[in-house]
A protein has these predicted regions:
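RNase H-like nuclease fold core
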Residues: 1-58, 63, 175
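Extended amphipathic alpha-helical interaction segments
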Residues: 49-59, 63-194, 207-218
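Amphipathic alpha-helical interaction/assembly segments
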Residues: 200-208
Length: 222
């Protein structure tokens, strides 16, 4: 999994780029960067993954992440939580900003249900079947439906369902977000004054996470 965490040092925004190994259950690479543009992310991932076995990288929906991972030629999957969050936002915004008839609302509600069938199924064959059914239903074409069906769900189907191909691939990025919250809760990441302090806190908290993680693994192995 890959993600970035913003923090501000003396009023200047910085980004912690981080790569999380699901199998090891910890961060395996982290870097403080000036930006999170696709070039910076590509360089970070390329260095971090050199000579490493790569299965798939999970991220949220930022385009900078997509561009960087596509350039790496590594399989890429989207976090299901962020996908649902984005879909909910798009539908809510469209409902709020447009005068819709009850019939139009029903049609859009059905569309959302059909999309969720794809996202919530537990096997790839069912996801493909629901995708084909979505196409066959021929929902009314307008800017909104075109964008959500033909520019998101259909072209990114593989990125939405990678976790169904391999059970070792998680469907969400919850683990990396959890470690971020443990290391840098909001009240801390807004108050860092110097880079050295940030790095020191990061390594101390990460070491604590790893020790706790190792204890839990040893405990569950008996």
């Amino acid at each position: 999994m890959f993600d970035s965490l913003w923090t501000r040092i003396n009023g200047v925004w910085k980004y912690i780029l981080a790569l999380f190994d699901v199998k090891l259950n910890t961060l395996v690479s982290a870097k403080l960067a000036e930006s999170e543009d696709s070039k910076t992310i590509y360089q970070f991932l390329n260095e971090s993954l050199r000579n490493q076995k790569k299965i798939s990288i999970g991220t949220d929906l930022k385009h900078e992440y997509r561009d960087a991972i596509d350039k790496l030629k590594v399989k890429h999957h989207f976090c299901k939580f962020h996908v649902k969050q984005e879909i909910n936002k798009r539908f809510k915004d469209y409902f709020d900003k447009n005068p819709l008839t009850e019939e139009e609302k029903d049609i859009l509600s059905n569309l959302k249900e059909d999309i969720y069938k794809i996202l919530d199924t537990n096997d790839l064959d069912s996801a493909k079947r629901y995708r084909n059914e979505l196409i066959d239903k021929k929902y009314p074409k307008n800017r909104f439906t075109n964008k959500i069906i033909w520019k998101f769900i259909i072209p990114y189907f593989k990125k939405l369902t990678t976790h169904l191909e391999n059970t070792n691939i998680p469907s969400t990025n919850n683990k990396i977000e959890n470690i971020f919250q443990k290391v840098f809760p909001k009240h801390i990441k807004r108050t860092m004054k110097i880079e050295h302090g940030l790095r020191t806190r990061f390594m101390l908290k990460l070491n604590h996470w790893n020790i706790k993680n190792e204890k839990e693994k040893n405990h569950t192995s008996f």
